[in-house]
């Protein structure tokens, strides 16, 4: 015969409720862990992108020929993979940039720097 607790439930009922709660928490932890590992794998894949021109691990832009290169390789105005002339690139945020304009601005800043 089973004993009764102060709140009127038998110990079997309390043990069943505890078992169900433990199983539910375990399932929630597994789902949380799988979700976290999936997100980590996706972001790691994006972080480990290397330039197709020089091999540097840098912030990459996408050229019109769909090759991913660093900004230094893109500013040469020619794709280092397929050797197509490139006039613009797609930034990581999806916006488009004119490579000629970026080159012009960088040259202007470089020319205005005083000699040490």
Curated annotation (Swiss-Prot):
Localization terms from the record: Host membrane
Keywords: Host membrane, Membrane, Transmembrane, Transmembrane helix
Transmembrane feature ranges: 13-33
Membrane topology: Single-pass membrane protein
GO cellular component: a single term: host cell membrane
Primary location group: host cell
Full protein name: Putative membrane protein
Organism, scientific name: Alethinophid 1 reptarenavirus (isolate AlRrV1/Boa/USA/BC/2009)
Lineage: Viruses, Riboviria, Orthornavirae, Negarnaviricota, Polyploviricotina
